[in-house]
Amino acid sequence: DYEHGVIGDLPNFPSFRGGVALGPYLESVFGIPVYVNNDGNLFAYGEALAGALPRVNKALEDAGCKRRYKNLIGITLGTGFGCGVVIDKVLLKGDNDCGGDVWCMRNGMYPFVIAEESVSIRAVRRVYAEMSHEEIGDLTPKDIGDIANGTRPGNMKAAQESFRQLGQVTAATLVNVLNIVDGIVVIGGGLTGNAKWILPGIMEEFARLAGTFSGNLLPTLQSEVYNFEDPEQRAAFLEDKDVYVDVPHTDKKVLYQAQRKVAVLVSELGASKAINLGAYNFAINQIEK
């Protein structure tokens, strides 16, 4: 319960049960206002105000493109699968403080398992162990990334596949979110050091088609997704394909955005800085209410 600063029955905080009034307690200790939110939300908020969203809009401006973006989905890939949504500078809270939660959504590869089981540090380790048939030991995602890059001994294909699968399930989850929010996607968190192995799985899944009973194939996203980290795709994303069309029975013309498109990019701020910026701005907004 972020509004009242109370931590409830969270699966990853077993010591907090029955409601712990953390915010009010810290206020009483330090004598200053205290506000509570989660890292996924604050990461997205920081990126929307001072990171990915301004970066994309500045690139569009520099390219002479008239389009601007107002909505952002921020995801953090690390110990778990975090997500936050910002719509026109407003952080999506939800009526139950669950706005943007995706970790417990259905897994795109294993429908009876939650998404986070394939989008987390433990997922990378599990897939590598399964595919390499090696004892995982204390290998970290950094180690597995080094194996994927060929700078550490190990099963390179298994290492690369462990990150590709993470990207695939990430995108399978985000397809539904993107169809509702319709904005830029920014990725952050500890696993993004291996983004070059994660992004192919994301883009592959975003391009997946779904059928109808009559046999037609349709894209699962209404907008085309571009990998902003790829120079060719970034250039295509920044290309202005908007046109002016005639207003019937008048001499007027109106702008028509002929192409629906969104972009996926990796955080330049980094998760820690984005979260700090998000937390600062969130607190300022709460104080000014």
Predicted regions and their residues:
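Short beta-strand scaffold segments in enzyme catalytic cores
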Residues: D1, G74-T76, F81-V86
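Short beta-strand-loop/turn "lid" adjacent to the catalytic site in phosphate-handling enzymes
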Residues: D1-G19, P33-Y35, E47, L77, ...
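ATP-binding/phosphotransfer module of carbohydrate and carboxylate kinases, centering on a glycine-rich
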Residues: Y2-H4, P24, S28-I32, A59-K66, ...
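Active-site nucleophile and cofactor-binding loops and adjacent substrate-binding regions
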Residues: N12-R17, Y35-F43, G74-L77, V266-A274
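A short acidic/small-residue loop/turn micro-motif
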Residues: S15, C98-D101
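Anion-binding (especially nucleotide phosphate/pyrophosphate-binding) glycine-rich loop
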Residues: G18-I32, G40, R55
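Conserved phosphate-binding catalytic cores of ATP/NTP-utilizing and phosphoryl-transfer enzymes
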Residues: V34-L72
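Short beta-strand-to-turn element immediately C-terminal to the catalytic PLP-Schiff-base lysine
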Residues: E47, G84-D88, L92-G94, N107
